[in-house]
Design a protein with these regions (language model features):
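Short, acidic/turn-prone active-site loops that include or flank metal/cofactor-
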Residues: 18-20, 42-46, 95-99, 118-122
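Alpha-helix-loop-beta-strand connector modules within alpha/beta enzyme cores
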Residues: 27-42, 80-98, 133-141
Length: 141
């Protein structure tokens, strides 16, 4: 199974889509309960949430014992909705930077972490770009 290979290679966690259903997620989770597993609730790209069943997928993440979920920084309203459904599970949110998600708004909506890719690795100065995103996450400003 892919999950076993990923963990054997040293990964400490895995991200899995919810749409294959509970059996698939359980089989991933049971490979190594000490590893983190995040369940994709909805996607960050335009129209990325159109075919996702947010309530059902959040319930599934709770049922299988996920560490957390993936919800889009491009739609903070979805992050807030997901947060209300998952309780203490973590939310990681892609879509900050190149896709237009706002880190501060996403954290305020309930995300625990943001995911930034191109906004850092395509920057002229990736270290400065990373620092900029870090400073934006202080919601006390």
């Amino acid at each position: 199974m892919i999950t076993e290979a990923v963990f054997s290679a040293g990964a400490t966690g895995i991200i899995a889509h919810a749409f294959p259903g509970p059996e698939s997620l359980r089989s991933i989770r049971e490979v190594d309960l000490s590893k983190e597993m995040y369940v994709v609730i909805t996607m960050s790209h335009p129209k990325g949430g159109d075919h996702f069943k947010i309530e059902e997928f959040c319930s599934l993440a709770l049922e299988v014992g996920a560490t957390g979920v993936v919800a889009p920084a491009t739609r903070p309203e979805d992050v807030a909705r997901v947060k209300s459904l998952i309780g203490d599970l973590e939310i990681i949110s892609p879509g900050v930077g190149a896709q237009g998600g706002d880190s501060k708004e996403t954290i305020r909506a309930g995300a625990d972490f943001i995911i930034v890719g191109r906004g850092i690795y395509q920057a002229d100065n990736p270290a400065s770009a990373a620092e900029k995103y870090m400073s934006e996450m202080d919601i006390n400003d």
